[in-house]
UniProtKB/Swiss-Prot annotation:
Textual note on the cofactor: Binds 2 manganese ions per subunit.
Catalysed conversion reaction: O-phospho-L-seryl-[protein] + H2O = L-seryl-[protein] + phosphate; O-phospho-L-threonyl-[protein] + H2O = L-threonyl-[protein] + phosphate
Residue positions binding Mn(2+) 1: D63, H65, D91
Protein name per its UniProtKB record: Serine/threonine-protein phosphatase beta isoform
Source organism (scientific name): Drosophila melanogaster (Fruit fly)
Listed result of changing Y133F: Semi lethal, adult escapers exhibit muscle and wing mutant phenotype; allele flw-6
The keyword Phosphoprotein is annotated on this UniProt entry: yes
Domain of life: Eukaryota
Pfam families from the UniProt entry: Metallophos, STPPase_N
Enzyme class per UniProt: hydrolase
Biased composition annotated in UniProt, kind: Polar residues: 308-319
Cofactor dependency: Mn(2+)
UniProt similarity note: Belongs to the PPP phosphatase family. PP-1 subfamily.
EC numbers for this chain: 3.1.3.16
Length: 330
């Protein structure tokens, strides 16, 4: 980065001006600014633990996938930082048409409010995945491949899990048969790519499945599925109350599993312009009461650059109907 002085406030201001503009308008950011965001946020990620220990109150959000206008809607609903503390569960890039604006605003907020704004790694924060599903092409079209590699270096340093007040375990994908204790997560070294198997892979890729006991094969061709019994054993062993994860489209933006011992959050409404799903976020108050805020899909369906690739996307396992928004978990 040399002597480049990153003006985060100016960047945030430009990124937020999109609220009054037409959907999909690109934000003008110099290559030096974007590179500066990656390098500075990478430093902060490495200064903080790979397994975050956070305190409520905070708002948790699931997949965003480059749907920048919807990210702004989430902040309008929950409050723009620092009005609220946030934890995002990964998958910031790919599929939507504004991955750059999305990840740049999130990294800028991380730099501006490092102790109040937290980002976990999703399976799309990985070079082999976002090389294919849109982010590489967006970087190459608007900047260059070198900048995409700078993002890769940043993503390789993201934390992979969080525990809120010793009771709520958060990650992008789910549990792992290799996970016996939290110290195993703390021992994961960064920077690191996402391997094809093992603990880090599973935290970012696994899925719950009501039809499985124990561990099962995953239709994605990566990692595993896990049953209700696995969830219950994990929570009991670690004296936890809830697993909060993302990684799957759910119709109402959130969906419970295993007698409300696990919740899936998905925060990209009308995903890829093809699904008629809502986007959800979960507010955890200081007593650990959880409530859900829902973004309905917009009336106008934006055109998504990579929606055509959705046909090759692994299908989400069918699961039971979600609980009503009035339900709360203590």
């Amino acid at each position: 980065m040399g002597d480049f002085d990153l003006n985060v406030d100016s960047l945030i201001q430009r990124l937020l001006e999109m609220r009054s503009c037409r959907t999909g308008k690109q934000v003008q950011m110099t290559e030096a600014e974007v590179r500066g965001l990656c390098l500075k946020s990478r430093e902060i990620f490495l200064q903080q633990p790979i397994l975050l220990e956070l305190e409520a109150p905070l708002i948790i959000c699931g997949d965003i996938h480059g749907q920048y206008t919807d990210l702004l809607r989430l902040f309008e609903y929950g409050g723009f930082p620092p009005a609220a503390n946030y934890l995002f569960l990964g998958d910031y890039v790919d599929r939507g048409k504004q991955s750059l604006e999305t990840i740049c605003l999130l990294l800028a907020y991380k730099i501006k409010y490092p102790e109040n704004f937290f980002l976990l790694r999703g399976n799309h924060e990985c070079a082999s995945i976002n090389r294919i599903y849109g982010f590489y092409d967006e970087c190459k079209r608007r900047y260059n491949v070198k900048l995409w590699k700078t993002f890769t270096d940043c993503f390789n340093c993201l934390p992979v899990a969080a525990i809120i007040d010793e009771k709520i375990f958060c990650c992008h994908g789910g549990l792992s048969p290799d996970l016996q204790g939290m110290e195993q997560i703390r021992r994961l070294m960064r920077p690191t790519d996402v391997p094809d198997t093992g603990l880090l892979c599973d935290l970012l890729w696994s899925d719950p499945d009501k039809d499985v006991q124990g561990w099962g094969e995953n239709d994605r061709g990566v990692s595993f599925t896990f049953g209700v019994d696995v969830v219950s054993k994990f929570l009991n062993r670690h004296e936890l109350d809830l697993i909060c994860r993302a990684h799957q489209v759910v119709e109402d933006g959130y969906e419970f599993f295993a007698r409300r011992q696990l919740v899936t959050l998905f925060s990209a409404p009308n995903y890829c312009g093809e699904f008629d799903n809502a986007g959800g976020m979960m507010t955890v108050d200081d007593t650990l009461m959880c409530s859900f805020q829902i973004l309905k899909p917009s009336e106008k369906k934006a055109k998504y650059l990579y929606s055509g690739m959705n046909s090759s996307r692994p299908t989400t396992p069918q699961r039971s109907a979600p609980m009503l928004a009035t339900n709360k978990k203590k």
